[in-house]
């Protein structure tokens, strides 16, 4: 019996919507990354993007444990001299709540073209509204 290898043109991708209200950031991000890679499917193949599309709503209501709300720092650089910036988790939630989940999930995906293709299937929204109703996403309870 030969080993099954998925082909990009035969992969069936579903759309799922996940509510992040009250979910722990890391535990949510690991499950999202797993589903974006397609590791939950029997036909998973490491070098083929077999993952599903994931819509995350209520990103502003994601939770962290302990003192991470004030202690967890996000760093970035503006590209200008002396342009290193940082913000706490609380500041990031106030400024751009989608980025918190996006950064967490992106770090858990493979680096390179395949990982970027997987990351593009993640859609994160701060509130409870999203504009993907035409795709008829199924509710995914994580």
Curated annotation (Swiss-Prot):
PROSITE patterns: RIBOSOMAL_L13
Single Gene Ontology MF annotation: mRNA binding
Cited CDD domains: Ribosomal_L13
GO CC terms, sorted: cytosolic large ribosomal subunit
Taxonomic superkingdom: Bacteria
SUPFAM superfamilies the UniProt entry points to: Ribosomal protein L13
Gene Ontology biological process terms in this record: negative regulation of translation; translation
Transmembrane segments: none
Keywords: Ribonucleoprotein, Ribosomal protein
A Pfam family that the UniProt record links to this protein: Ribosomal_L13
Subunit structure: Part of the 50S ribosomal subunit.
Stated role: This protein is one of the early assembly proteins of the 50S ribosomal subunit, although it is not seen to bind rRNA by itself. It is important during the early stages of 50S assembly.
Protein family: Belongs to the universal ribosomal protein uL13 family.
Protein name: Large ribosomal subunit protein uL13
Lineage summary: Bacteria, Pseudomonadati, Pseudomonadota, Gammaproteobacteria, Pasteurellales
Gene (name only): rplM
